[in-house]
Amino acid sequence: MRIRKTGQKIQKVLLTVLFLLLLAGCLYLADRLVERKDSREKNGDYFAAAPKADVLLLGSSHMINGINPAVLYENFGIASYNLGGHGNVLPVTYWEFVNALDYGTPKYAVIDTYLLEKDYQYLDVMTDAESDADRSAAIDQLHEVMDAFPYGKNKRGALADLISDSSLRREFAFDFIRYHSRWSSLERGDYEGVFGKPCGESILGAQLRYEVDPGVSLYPRVDPSEKFEEATVGKTYLRRILDLCREKDIFPILVQVPFAENEDLQRIANSAQDIADEYGIPFLNMNYVENIINPETDQQSQTHLNALGAAKTSAWLGAVLSSEVGVPDRRGEAGYELWEAAVRKYHQQIVANILNPEDLYAELMTLNFNDVSTIIFINNDSVAFYDESLRKLIKNLSGTDGIDVMAGTKLGYCLIHDPVTDTNEETKGTVPLENIKTSFGTVNFTTLENYDLLSVGENTDENQLDYVNNGNIDVQILVYDPASGEKIGHLYFRDGGLVRG
């Protein structure tokens, strides 16, 4: 009898344990299902990259949008990961760095100094200068930074240091508390994300912007000696980041990602030089380096770079890290497949944006990557001739001022841009383009006052321009695969906007 009772007790205990395990599993799956996936989409690859990454890129959205790990690896073999966060003030950057070091210790840290002037620690308090909307946005942005990291000692320390309200801190410990109401808005990506299937467009943490802001304001450059001298919480936490680097034997490099900043922002950026001097480390203020970017073609907004600006900035930074700092070249070494895959994803992303651009500005910007071959046709007297930003983007491709010459002639303009054969040919007045050899065939173009003929291949009478359905279109762009020579796209634009077929 005693044996039977003992067996029943054991059975009850086992059933209770099994029930608790099933309950925990269901809660875990529900938590993963309803969470917003942006944090794991942004930094999910970090945990695989951490043991191999030589460089961590830290900072605000300027870092996310401005430094591309795929460019660093493709051009220089630099194995990096972009841990920048939207709206990251330096206290957030510090704690993200602390949590990241639980998974790997890089040899180098590149730290963007933007938002150095911010003088608050608690995101849910801030100062009188910020609104409730600012505080709410900061908490949302912190979720994107921190949700990917498992809850533990350092995440708990981050929340205690960054959020004063204990109820808000609990949301970060259990995503289900914050996101339980998302059941009605779940999408396919939410279910795939439960099982770790990758989603989204981040490239090793970088998020590239394939748009152009043609209305960026430009400001005179202030002298580097003009600085923001006030002590701030931002400066305190930058020093904490540098102290942590010293403790972990990580070599830090301070940077200012370039953009068209006003005079006050320039003075704030310049003040990072004093902290760099204090620690005896480099400060690369790229706003004082000539010709890294052209703000009129390389920015997505007044303060953020687009994908082309990011490529240029990353190429400049990579050259410095490689030749002057001594970051190793990992190309050809085993174990860096994650970076090789990121390079492939990057180029696939470029082509996808070429074939489905936001507008004509975005299209011309993205064609600068030379991932496709193209023919650009502008109809006679098109508004595109009178848009200075569009002309600058075309001149980036052609390498000449030919588009300026053609503006106002009442004649069509044609540019043949073929990176495979290094061909850049454009119309000059009424002189036809004859027998231009390209990777996708022989091109001929004739422009008349009321008609233009573009042929590709042997049949010189077959017009590749669509005059039947789109004769009044401002701009037509033909896109060719550089490997096969096949036409993969024919895009139409009116008044700068994409006309979808």
Residue ranges and their predicted role:
Residues 1-10:
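N-terminal Lys/Arg-rich, disordered targeting/topogenic segments
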Residues 11-31:
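Hydrophobic membrane-insertion alpha-helices, especially the h-region
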Residues 32-53:
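Alpha-helical transmembrane signal-anchor/signal-peptide segments
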Residues 58, 62-152:
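Membrane-embedded segments
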Residues 128-248, 329-350:
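Secreted/periplasmic serine-hydrolase-like ester/acetyl group-modifying domain
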Residues 239-265:
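Active-site segments of SGNH/GDSL-like serine hydrolases
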Residues 266-341:
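C-terminal regions of proteins
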Residues 351-374, 378-501:
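Short acidic-hydrophobic catalytic motif
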